[in-house]
């Protein structure tokens, strides 16, 4: 089981954490949402819970709750710039289908 970050994503997360001045790392998860069933959750983690799984890649701690791990295993988190837009992109090998707007997915 693993989660990885591209260099661009790791640099962006390290920058956000440094500007924030606190935090254990980046928490990734999934929640029920959208027309395809699930959506990604990405937030800073100030604490690591007992049921969390922690990965470290490129100097960044990535924290996943136990229920989300099955949906995120093998995912690579990237940070991309496309024209005037920029943001995190999940490259998830478990995704079977995405909705038309790209906001939710099924496995």
UniProtKB/Swiss-Prot annotation:
Record keywords, A-Z: Iron, Metal-binding
Cofactor stoichiometry and binding remark: Binds 2 iron ions per dimer. The dimer may bind additional iron ions.
Domain of life: Bacteria
One GO cellular component, as annotated: cytosol
Disulfide bond sites: none
GO MF annotation list: 2 iron, 2 sulfur cluster binding; iron ion binding
One Gene Ontology term from the biological process aspect of the record: iron-sulfur cluster assembly
Keyword Iron appears in the UniProt entry: yes
Metal-binding keyword on record: yes
Requisite cofactors: Fe cation
Residues where Fe cation binds: 35, 99, 101
Subunit structure: Homodimer; may form tetramers and higher multimers.
Record family assignment: Belongs to the HesB/IscA family.
Role description: Is able to transfer iron-sulfur clusters to apo-ferredoxin. Multiple cycles of [2Fe2S] cluster formation and transfer are observed, suggesting that IscA acts catalytically. Recruits intracellular free iron so as to provide iron for the assembly of transient iron-sulfur cluster in IscU in the presence of IscS, L-cysteine and the thioredoxin reductase system TrxA/TrxB.
Classification via HAMAP family: Fe_S_insert_IscA (MF_01429)
Name of the protein described by the UniProt record: Iron-binding protein IscA
Originating species: Proteus mirabilis (strain HI4320)
